[in-house]
């Protein structure tokens, strides 16, 4: 049926901030939906609170509202815009839950807004555990024995009847939030309690556990006519029991028989038909590996993380097709953009293997519980495409960027002596490290059957891993052979003998190298096994023409000719990435993406990569992208002229450069991932565009940067380097406390601490770092002043500063975890001018061509530089959106030779707007048990939101509400702070009391507050009698927790338990007094009943331009 003609304006709900369980895949889905509707001439209104997304660009929708994803704000937008329809299925679980609230409130009926795509009754059939169970029973689809409950006692009674273990699945949550596997009653009590609290309707499903069965997913599409197709089937390498977001996933399924595949495919089509889904749908099955028995585990009646993976794996644009269906089209009326010939009714066919590997945040959280279960813990994922499983697996591993370029280095040298018992013990645990223990077990010649019995991983996958290990063994034997034949034991002679061997004896060794490359082994991995250098391995390959070809993703296994330049590498194959007949390399530029989403490197860098490509297209350049993240907009085949789905690893990038011969490579916009590649690529002859590699080094090398600051007359906090604990103490005495300490060999704020006393320093040096001449520790003065952040653009001569951001938390909290307001409110004119002057001097002094990010601290009236990043930063999307200045486009054009004057921009600091914008961090602590929620120099947030308004307090309120703070004006506040913070906390406590909240405090804090004349109820510590602090939190008597801590003291351990209890009970826990003050400001705004207006970003910017 044709498109509906009654839809003139449609509202799309986005998914909000990046959190574990809901990442950047919804930015990809939302941008596709916006594009589809605008192509059809429909006016698009978008609401999303995440400024880092591409979907919130003003050119993506006619009206963009950066407002909290809360029912009251959506209602205000509906009242103002009067849309004809609403699409909620592109906003993940957040979108679905909001749609349900809007339907139940009657607001959609009142304003005659149609819920487009899947209906609310269909959504409830899939999401409400009770209704879903009944529906499956009605159509004869098997589900595990289960019961829907709303109390812990009900859960216990059911588990007692069916026996342990049981799985808990909350209704209306994302990423398995609140769920888990309970092995006994004690575990069930805790998991069920969390699950009930996490569920939108306080409902959980307790079901019989089928751990060990295969987990298989089907991505299905249906239109209003009832046409259904399966787009992709995917098999989890990990058996049931590990959340699919934390599993290794293969597409297409690798171990199913045709009978099993057809059985599950028919079941999937039957289920989507019964649920009357209109659009995309993900269905998860558990399959008994020993019979044809299966269970339906879950149905997601919306675009999901798996949808993004299936889209990139097949080339079938699921979100785009679902959006077309939502406005009335049927599948046979939608054409396939990849082939340009087939319709969307044509099921994709794959002649390659796709693998997804999860990216976990445990490199940031050493003490976190690494055990995997039904509650997701991965922050992101990578995808790889190969002609065989081994190739795809090793590519995906390289793409993870976890300091393990390949499996050969996955277990440290010390682990060579591991006993078999220890390996078997580790195999029995389901942790993020299980893959490396699997390989270690195979190396130790533990039988595959024994490994299978312990892990339930299919023998097919274990054999593939054994194939990889066999190459290691063959190359190691080759090294021994050549060393025995070499008199001088000389590396060059070994290389010559290796070459000679390859040329002679029927090229046996050359064949081994060729087969190893076909299986995905990197030069690094082969180097580690043979004893040769990477450069030697590379030279041997090139000499014998062992280089990758590039195959095209075409959705149809070559049955139809494809138009889409979307490639992956393969050895010993015909090359399908044929360059244009006319050489155009002087108008061709490669942009490096940012890889998987992780803490410290989020969707902001995908935003930057995409905007760089758009700028190159504006200039008439052919744009190329290398990236490996299936969730992102940058890996949409429509964004760049040619997309390479490859690891961001030196060898893989160099191979693409050799294939495409671009004019240059842009590394500024892919975060630290791309920046780290700049030097090795330049060393190999690539032209790094923008700021030179040597100038990047001047910004990042401590000594060189200090020399520049001295030359420019710019201050920075005093600091020195210690190579021993004794020296650290001497430096500390010289500089004075407090101090910032960090290991010199760790980037990105990892293992950084603020120490306030000699005891703090002793604890840090003992437990946090290994200090030696090879691994020195950097010690700097900690100036707890106002932190200022600037993103600027330089064309080599002039500097544009869109605006100045002021951090709400003082220095000491990582900039990514700080709230930031724009424009800066607390700067006097002299300080502002000095910051602008310093920024211009640094940009010019470092010969920046592109973007520079600078962080300052203003302390006792002086301005100090604390960090300079010669690349795009996390705040670029935020500052670009609220000022209307497209920083990445300006920077890219400057790199390509266009001055600001040529582009029509004036240099200097831009005028301040009349409105305020506040950026707030968002954390995923609830998903990561045993992680301390306290904020410090090491980044912990996974995403961000924005609040905007003409009133700063209201903008602050919106930002805190959007970030997940539950803001209300009743209940109690628990205050327990370190001695150094007691004086500063007093006025905050008085403000809480003025709002009518009851004050609770631990003994030391309570005594101080009483002495100040403040009425406070003292509560026992955790080690004391009951009811204690934890009991009060669990009983709901406390609505806010303010807790600061002291390093290495007993209260820190008490504080950890308090902070965790707050997080696990959904209570705001504030570990910075500045954040507490900001919350109070928001609460006071609410108390005054100030009106909360909504206004589109376009309308704000329109006033700025007038």
From Swiss-Prot:
Mg(2+) 4 binds at residues 867, 869. InterPro entries: ATP-grasp (IPR011761), CarbamoylP_synth_lsu (IPR006275), CarbamoylP_synth_lsu_oligo (IPR005480), CarbamoylP_synth_lsu_oligo_sf (IPR036897), CbamoylP_synth_lsu-like_ATP-bd (IPR005479), CbamoylP_synth_lsu_CPSase_dom (IPR005483), MGS-like_dom (IPR011607), MGS-like_dom_sf (IPR036914). GO terms for molecular function: ATP binding; carbamoyl-phosphate synthase (ammonia) activity; carbamoyl-phosphate synthase (glutamine-hydrolyzing) activity; metal ion binding. It comes from the Bacteria. Residues 578-964 are annotated as: Carbamoyl phosphate synthetic domain. Its cofactor is Mg(2+); Mn(2+). One of its GO terms (cellular component) is cytoplasm. ATP 1 binds at residues 129, 169, 175-176, 208, 210, 215, 241-243, 284, 298. ATP 2 binds at residues 742, 781, 783, 787, 812-815, 855, 867. Binds 4 Mg(2+) or Mn(2+) ions per subunit. SUPFAM superfamilies: Carbamoyl phosphate synthetase, large subunit connection domain, Glutathione synthetase ATP-binding domain-like, Methylglyoxal synthase-like, PreATP-grasp domain. Mn(2+) 1 binds at residues 284, 298. Mn(2+) 4 binds at residues 867, 869. It catalyses: hydrogencarbonate + L-glutamine + 2 ATP + H2O = carbamoyl phosphate + L-glutamate + 2 ADP + phosphate + 2 H(+). Coiled coil: none annotated. Mn(2+) 2 binds at residues 298, 300. Belongs to the CarB family. This is Carbamoyl phosphate synthase large chain. The gene is carB.
């Amino acid at each position: 049926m044709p498109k509906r003609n009654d839809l003139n304006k449609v509202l799309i709900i986005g998914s909000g901030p990046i959190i574990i369980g809901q990442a950047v895949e919804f930015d990809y889905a939302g941008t596709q939906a916006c594009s589809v509707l605008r192509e059809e001439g429909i006016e698009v209104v978008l609401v999303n609170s995440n400024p880092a997304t591409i979907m919130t660009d003003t050119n993506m929708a006619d009206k963009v509202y950066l407002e909290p994803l809360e029912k009251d704000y959506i209602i205000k937008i509906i009242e103002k815009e009067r849309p004809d329809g609403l699409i909620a299925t592109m906003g993940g679980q957040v979108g679905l839950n909001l749609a349900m609230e809007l339907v139940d409130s009657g607001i959609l009926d009142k304003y005659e807004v149609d819920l487009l795509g899947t209906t609310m009754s269909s959504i409830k059939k899939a999401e409400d555990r009770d209704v879903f169970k009944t529906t499956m029973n009605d159509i004869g689809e098997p589900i595990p024995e289960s019961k829907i409950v709303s109390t812990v006692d009900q859960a216990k009674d059911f588990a007692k009847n069916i026996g342990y273990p049981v799985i808990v699945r909350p209704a209306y949550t994302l990423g398995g939030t609140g769920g888990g596997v309970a092995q006994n009653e004690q575990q069930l009590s805790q998991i069920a309690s969390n699950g009930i609290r996490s569920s939108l309707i306080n409902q959980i499903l307790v079901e019989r556990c089928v751990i060990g069965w295969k987990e298989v997913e089907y991505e299905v599409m249906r239109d209003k006519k009832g046409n259904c197709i399966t787009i992709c089937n995917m098999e989890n390498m990990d058996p049931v029991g590990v959340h699919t977001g934390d599993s290794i996933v293969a597409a297409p399924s690798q171990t199913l028989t045709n009978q099993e595949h057809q059985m599950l495919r028919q079941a999937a089509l039957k289920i989507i038909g019964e649920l009357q889904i209109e659009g995309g749908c993900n269905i998860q099955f558990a399959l008994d590996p020993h019979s044809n028995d299966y269970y339906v585990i879950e149905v997601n009646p919306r675009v999901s993380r798996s949808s993004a993976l299936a889209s990139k794996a097949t080339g079938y644009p699921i979100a785009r097709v679902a959006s077309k269906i939502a406005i009335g089209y049927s599948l046979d009326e939608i054409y396939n953009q990849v082939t340009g010939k087939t319709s969307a009714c044509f099921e994709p066919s794959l002649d390659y293997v796709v693998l997804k590997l999860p990216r976990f945040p445990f490199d940031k959280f050493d003490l976190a519980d690494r055990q995997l279960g039904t509650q997701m813990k991965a922050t992101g994922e990578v995808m790889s495409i190969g002609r065989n499983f081994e190739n795809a697996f090793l590519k995906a591993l390289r793409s993870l960027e976890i300091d393990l370029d390949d499996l050969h280095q996955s277990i440290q040298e010390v682990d060579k002596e591991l006993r078999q018992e220890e390996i078997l013990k580790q195999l029995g645990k389901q942790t993020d490290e299980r893959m490396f223990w699997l390989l270690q077990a195979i190396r130790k010649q533990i039988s595959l059957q024994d490994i299978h019995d312990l892990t339930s991983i299919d023998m097919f996958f274990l054999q593939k891993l054994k194939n990889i290990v066999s190459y290691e063994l063959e190359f190691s034997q080759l090294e021994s052979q050549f060393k025995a034949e070499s008199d001088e034991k000389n590396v060059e002679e070994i290389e010559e003998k290796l070459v000679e061997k390859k040329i002679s004896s029927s090229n046996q060794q050359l064949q081994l190298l060729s087969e190893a490359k076909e299986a995905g082994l990197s030069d690094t991995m082969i180097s580690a096994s043979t004893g040769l250098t990477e450069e030697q391995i590379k030279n041997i390959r090139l000499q014998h023409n062992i280089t990758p070809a590039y195959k095209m993703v075409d959705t149809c296994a070559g049955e139809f000719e494809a138009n889409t330049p979307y490639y992956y590498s393969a050895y010993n194959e015909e090359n399908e990435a044929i360059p244009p007949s006319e050489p155009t390399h002087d108008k061709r530029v490669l942009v490096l993406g940012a890889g998987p989403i992780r803490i410290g490197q989020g969707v902001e860098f995908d935003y930057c990569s995409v905007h760089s490509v758009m700028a190159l297209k504006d200039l008439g350049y052919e744009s190329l992208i290398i990236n490996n993240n299936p969730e992102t907009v940058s890996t949409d085949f429509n964004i760049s002229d040619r997309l390479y789905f490859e690891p961001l690893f030196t060898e893989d990038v160099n191979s693409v450069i050799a294939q495409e011969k671009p004019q240059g490579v842009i590394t500024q916009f892919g975060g630290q991932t791309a920046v780290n590649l700049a030097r090795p690529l330049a060393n190999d002859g690539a032209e790094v565009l923008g700021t030179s590699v040597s100038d990047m080094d001047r910004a990042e090398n401590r000594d060189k940067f200090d020399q520049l600051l001295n030359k420019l007359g710019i201050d920075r906090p005093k600091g020195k380097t210690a190579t021993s604990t004794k020296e650290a103490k001497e430096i500390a005495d010289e500089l004075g406390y407090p101090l910032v300490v960090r290991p010199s060999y760790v980037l990105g704020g990892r293992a950084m601490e603020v120490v306030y006393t000699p005891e703090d320093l002793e604890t840090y040096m003992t437990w946090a770092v290994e200090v030696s001449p090879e691994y020195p520790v950097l010690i700097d003065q900690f100036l707890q002043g106002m932190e200022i952040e600037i993103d600027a653009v330089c064309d080599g001569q002039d500097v544009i500063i869109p605006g100045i951001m002021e951090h709400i938390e003082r220095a000491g909290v990582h900039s990514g975890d700080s709230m930031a307001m724009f424009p800066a409110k607390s700067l006097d004119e002299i300080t502002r001018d000095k910051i602008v002057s310093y920024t211009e001097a640094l940009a010019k002094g470092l010969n920046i061509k592109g973007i520079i990010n600078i962080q300052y601290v203003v302390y006792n009236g002086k301005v100090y530089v604390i960090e300079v990043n010669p690349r795009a930063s996390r705040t670029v999307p935020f500052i670009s959106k609220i000022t209307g200045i497209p920083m990445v486009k300006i920077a890219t054009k400057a790199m390509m030779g266009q001055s600001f004057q040529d582009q029509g921009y004036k240099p200097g600091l831009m005028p301040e707007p009349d409105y305020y914008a506040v950026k707030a961090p968002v954390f995923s602590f609830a998903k990561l048990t045993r992680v301390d929620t306290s904020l410090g120099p090491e980044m912990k947030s996974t995403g961000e939101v924005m609040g905007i308004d003409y009133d700063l307090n209201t903008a602050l309120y919106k930002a805190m509400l959007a970030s997940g703070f539950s803001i209300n004006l009743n209940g109690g506040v628990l205050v327990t702070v370190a001695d150094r913070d007691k004086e500063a906390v007093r006025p905050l406590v008085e403000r809480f009391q003025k709002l009518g909240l009851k004050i609770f405090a631990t003994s030391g804090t309570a005594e101080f507050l009483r002495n100040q004349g403040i009425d406070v109820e003292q509560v026992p510590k955790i080690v004391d009698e009951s009811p204690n602090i934890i009991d009060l939190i669990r009983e709901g008597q406390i609505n806010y927790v303010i807790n600061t801590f002291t390093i290495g003291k007993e209260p820190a351990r008490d504080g950890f338990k308090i902070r965790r209890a707050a997080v696990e009970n959904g209570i705001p826990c504030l570990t910075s007094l500045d954040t507490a003050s900001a919350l109070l400001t928001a609460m006071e705004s609410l108390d005054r009943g100030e009106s909360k207006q909504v206004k589109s970003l376009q309308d704000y910017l329109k006033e700025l331009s007038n």
